[in-house]
Amino acid sequence: MSATKPTTLYDKIWNDHLAHEAEDGTCLLYIDRHLVHEVTSPQAFEGLRTAGRKVHAPEKTLAVVDHNVPTTDRSKPNPDPESAEQIAALAENAREFGVTYYNEFDKRQGVVHVIGPEQGFTLPGTTIVCGDSHTSTHGAFGALAHGIGTSEVEHVLATQTLIQKKAKNMRVTVDGDLPAGVTAKDIILAIIGEIGTAGGTGYVLEYAGSAIRALSMEGRMTVCNMSIEGGARAGLIAPDEKAYAYLKGRPLAPKGEAWDAAMRYWQTLRSDEGAHFDHEIRLDAAALPPIVTWGTSPEDVISITGKVPNPADIADEAKRLSKERALAYMGLNPGTKITDIKIDRMFIGSCTNGRIEDLRAAAKVAEGKTVNANVNAIIVPGSGLVKEQAEAEGLDKIFIAAGFEWREPGCSMCLAMNPDKLAPDERCASTSNRNFEGRQGFKGRTHLVSPAMAAAAAIAGHFVDIREWR
């Protein structure tokens, strides 16, 4: 009898959920969890209504408003009629189809990829989808999670399955100890800088190595969150005691004997020794600096001690022209020190860096300091429960005393779909995940950084090396 072939974590979860495979490789995958928000769901629910279908498994579906909700006073009407309409539609659709829904006044409300793990809806070994590209966040728990389009949202609502083709396996190993001031955000920005925004195309990434194991669950979520910016379908980290401890006792997590049974399965969720990966890359955590993006792609990364690069040094013409356009859009000149770049706005929040650990890191920097007079700085907790925890720890008082605005939970300035957005040519230090043209507002200029780096920039009025912060 032959031994079982060593298998990757991705392959294990895929195989456990494979319902059917056609000759051309097209597969039908069972979906365990479906997260829904107000932007990509209205047409999907309308499709069900038109066809006379029900939601196949409402108990496996969780809806929340996040993209369009104002982060200021919610007792006032939403200033954008289209946003208000989408929010009202989600409330009505959830009621009509029997789906659990967290509205903007529910303390469980927040960014969809913050509330999933927080509620214990996200579990190891599950397949999770959402009409949102940053669904890869949930891979921090060893779940196979990725974004889907609106037509696929309807398909999952109706059938609890998804049609797709299997991806390849890539392992990203990060070993060594992170230096002081260097965070999970810097790890993932460094990875994207290494592989480029297309480097992960066609792959599911598994993050491994001692530096990844050393991260908290919040840090692991930050890493997995930006897998899509590296071009990957999803990102995974094998679950361990940190993941189990995070989930135990959460409202929607298994209890009692069900927990014990789940644990027996979860403990098998790791890539076997000798499992084949189609591609491997390695990074040394000890060599990583605090990172800032300088251009209009998440791959445009540079050390805080660096200078804006010169596109003239790039041999490939298409790439050179692309980087010249990025510099023109960002209003930067080659050779400018990163620490000489002044900012107008600062945003701490999003599904990348809106969790309690992120707010603690920012508060440590902000305590006893004052936001620069030329900077508007907002802090948006990732959920109502994160906000509640931060306030219990007095973090809100630290921020407010320093001149930061303390807001209600939501996607906020991560994307220009709500009142929190940049004006043309405003420059923002942001803890979000995308620095594309117009992402935070028409002609807005975004630099991606860690929470501590963002807070320090807001206080100094320009980017500073957090390793030298006093």
Swiss-Prot record:
Binds 1 [4Fe-4S] cluster per subunit. Its EC number is 4.2.1.33. It is an enzyme of class 4 (lyase). GO terms for molecular function: 3-isopropylmalate dehydratase activity; 4 iron, 4 sulfur cluster binding; metal ion binding. Pathway: Amino-acid biosynthesis; L-leucine biosynthesis; L-leucine from 3-methyl-2-oxobutanoate: step 2/4. Pfam families: Aconitase. Catalyzes the isomerization between 2-isopropylmalate and 3-isopropylmalate, via the formation of 2-isopropylmaleate. This is 3-isopropylmalate dehydratase large subunit. It comes from Rhodopseudomonas palustris (strain BisA53).
